[in-house]
């Protein structure tokens, strides 16, 4: 636990972070996509209970969608890529199973994967002539079931074009967003929805329903998170006030109770574009860090004006902690908090090479550019990286939507890469909170010989499922803190503190 002095120092470096010279990291291009196995990967990768990485491509696969069918893929610990689903299985338009997957996959409590497609499905709308999108479930073996087709209601009142990753909340239900649709103005400004694992969808909020008052936001696109208080938090790409002529304003941060009550807690750039010192157009999922504060990014604005990284209290007090200047990257994609409590992120463009984007670190030393894409001729190392994910081996993984193999796609079909920064292997608890008696899945590496599990020093019973998965139970008397797992190769510690509830 940090002392009050340490907390003060932590706050100070966030406020005054400055660019510093990067120490040596190891960047490795693991593979180039070749269109047949997919193209334009755009999702944050996830690590599943089998230890493999999973993601999607927005293009490639079956050649029936003018290049935009999309695929789902997995990568094993040897770096082998397997395409385990290609969209538009029927081989012709319309793609009833969906097309252009969007938002990261999630693995739900039933072990299956869930995700969305922006287009496809049987229902067309004013802004989605090739289908208004789907929600799907797919088994680890690749059997896909469509759970919901959007625009199933008159005037797309249920939403259209879902965007961002789904979230499985503590009540077991899935929550997500659509970028358009709903009963608002001009074909709808987007919705928030709740979905059971059986496919029953309930629209719980419609954005800008009281046009021209769009203070709740317009176009949620990057997925929700569940805060420590049980409420959901997210961002809308635009909106935040009263729409004036064509001015859509510059985005919001909102809080959503599970009963559907939405509160806008921050509106960006109320001073008016381009003077947006607090940023404009929020991107990526919010992160509620180990200190309870929310962190996020905006795609534009700041003093650069190439976007910002910010922190914000639950009451809406926002502080800009870094403003991109172009040479350090521009137009960030989002951030994540790693096992060392530091923040890692990516930018879509700019950087030292003038294009391609960057990977960066924000820690107690300050802001550090870790890698500049397009460092190789013709951007064969990739360009426009996704938000990073950290594997339980301590290594960061990500994709780039362009660059790489120039022979298969104009400008490259995209890449998959890794970045090491000297971080150790760890275990990840899912969920990372719960009361005594709750089952918890521990993900890690080399867990087959696990000999003990403890919650902040309290021994727990456990069952070894595989080399990458152990199931344990929160023991009676446990207190909040790190989980430790003893294996033949040493002791692994959880990446975040497990929060014991009562």
How should each PLM-predicted stretch be described?
Residues 2-502:
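Extracellular beta-propeller repeat domains
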